[in-house]
Each structure stands twice: as structure tokens, then as C-alpha cells.
């Protein structure tokens, strides 16, 4: 059973692709038509593939596997943080640091440093230092939080990565390919479905489109971890969208 209706997808503007001249021919199977020079995405396939993605992450989460959400573009950053936190998952919504996955040992040491500085900050230890030393540590803390806050509790590589904007997050996707980490990605008409495990053809620029799709995936992860969402949680989730 589909977890989203075609009406919901239409209302969120999921069907609007890029200008036809900017397309990637590999996306042809997911394009319904062209209208006024804009490619229109086949929402039947969007619904089917989003349902497949949700079933996949729900089962994976039920089995204890961990999901990382990735989206650093302005339209996605806030949604990525909100939805990942809601389903108790990891996220990166600022700049992707090269080697975040393939050089995890080094990144993990920076995550450990972030936690140490946060402990020192919360205990008041930094406040007891001379002003210059305290200022240096606070600058370091702010920088680490900016890039690593969404993965500060991540102790190992994620089992699945959910991506918004393939073109922007190429480095991260290549790292996933190298490590054999499955990817789910919102793919606009200028992307390539060949390097993604579960492509979700959709508008990756519109906030409502991103929020609808990422929200559905977060719902599925939540249900996989904790069981069916309570009615109050479902209402809150719908209002957020």
C-alpha cells in the first residue's frame, strides 16, 4: 500500500523537474512529460519508490540499523535536522567534510573532541579559564558543532544514507559507493539513478517537496524503532508538514 497519495505529491510540487535542457537522459524512465520547457516527473513512480524506501528503512530500523540523513543545501538543512532528530537518527546539514565516511577514524576523533568540549562547557570548566584560552576553546567548539553536531553520538559508520540533492552531495555518495553503504536519494531530472540504491524521482529544490519525502522516511524509521506512531504524534507530524 502506498504511503503517500498522488494528491499529496502534487500539492507539494514534487512533480516539477528542471528545465528540459538540463536533464540527464538516464532519468528518462521517471519523466512523465515536458511542459513549457520543464520536465514533469512521473508521480506514480515517485509514490512507488518512496513506499519502497520507507519499507526498507522501517525494516532496517527494526533490525537496529542506523540511518544518516544528508542535505546541506539551504532549502533542506533545517528539514534534515528536524526530521533526523525526530526519528533519533544522525544527520549532516552543513558542509560535508571529505572523508567523513571513508576516513571515519579521523572524523571520530573530532567527534570525541566535540563531546569533550561540550562536557567542559556544561560543567563550567571553560568559564574558569583565562579569557583568551576560553575564547579559543569556544571558537573550536562552535566550529565542531557546526559540522559534527548531527553525528556526535555516532560511534560507527551508518548502515543507510538518505540524501537530498545528488549533484551537490557527490562526494558523500562516492564514499557510500566505496564502502558499500546503501543510499536513498531524492533525484531531480538532472541526476543519475544508476549510482543510487533506491532513487526517489522528485523535485529536490522545493521545501514542501523535500519535507514531504524526508518526513515520510522519518516516520518509517520511527515506526521501525518504536512501533506505530501514536495518534498525537501523527497529528503533530502532519502539522509539521
Curated annotation (Swiss-Prot):
GO cellular component: chloroplast; small ribosomal subunit
Iron-sulfur listed as a keyword: no
SUPFAM superfamilies linked: Ribosomal protein S2 (SSF52313)
PROSITE patterns the record matches: RIBOSOMAL_S2_1, RIBOSOMAL_S2_2
Record-level Gene Ontology MF annotations: structural constituent of ribosome
Keywords: Chloroplast, Plastid, Ribonucleoprotein, Ribosomal protein
Pfam families membership: Ribosomal_S2
Intracellular or extracellular location(s): Plastid, Chloroplast
Annotated transmembrane regions: none
InterPro entries: Ribosomal_uS2, Ribosomal_uS2_bac/mit/plastid, Ribosomal_uS2_CS, Ribosomal_uS2_flav_dom_sf
Example GO biological process: translation
UniProt entry tagged with the keyword Chloroplast: yes
Record-stated family: Belongs to the universal ribosomal protein uS2 family.
NCBIfam families: rpsB_bact
HAMAP family, A to Z: Ribosomal_uS2_B
Protein name per UniProt: Small ribosomal subunit protein uS2c
Organism expressing this protein natively: Porphyra purpurea
Amino acid at each position: 500500500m502506498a504511503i503517500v497519495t498522488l494528491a499529496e505529491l502534487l500539492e507539494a510540487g514534487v512533480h516539477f523537474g528542471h528545465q528540459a535542457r538540463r536533464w540527464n537522459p538516464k532519468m528518462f524512465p521517471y519523466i512523465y512529460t515536458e511542459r513549457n520547457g520543464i520536465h514533469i516527473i512521473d508521480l506514480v513512480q515517485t509514490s512507488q519508490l518512496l513506499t519502497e524506501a520507507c519499507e526498507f528503512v522501517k525494516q532496517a530500523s527494526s533490525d537496529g540499523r542506523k540511518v544518516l540523513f544528508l542535505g546541506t543545501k539551504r532549502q533542506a538543512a533545517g528539514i534534515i535536522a528536524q526530521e533526523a532528530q525526530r526519528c533519533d537518527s544522525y544527520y549532516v546539514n552543513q558542509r560535508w567534510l571529505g572523508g567523513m565516511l571513508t576516513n571515519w577514524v579521523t572524523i571520530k576523533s573530532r567527534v570525541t573532541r566535540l563531546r569533550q568540549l561540550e562536557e567542559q562547557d556544561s560543567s563550567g570548566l571553560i568559564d574558569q579559564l583565562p579569557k583568551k584560552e576560553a575564547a579559543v576553546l569556544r571558537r573550536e567548539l562552535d566550529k565542531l558543532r557546526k559540522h559534527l553536531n548531527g553525528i556526535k553520538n555516532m560511534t560507527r559508520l551508518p548502515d543507510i544514507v538518505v540524501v537530498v540533492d545528488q549533484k551537490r552531495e557527490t562526494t558523500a555518495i562516492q564514499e557510500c559507493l566505496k564502502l558499500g553503504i546503501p543510499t536513498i536519494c531524492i533525484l531531480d531530472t538532472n541526476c543519475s539513478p544508476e549510482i543510487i540504491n533506491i532513487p526517489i524521482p522528485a523535485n529536490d529544490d522545493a521545501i514542501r517537496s523535500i519535507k514531504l519525502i524526508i518526513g515520510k522516511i522519518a516516520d518509517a524509521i520511527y515506526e521501525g524503532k518504536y512501533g506505530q506512531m501514536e495518534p498525537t504524534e501523527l497529528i503533530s507530524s502532519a502539522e509539521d508538514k
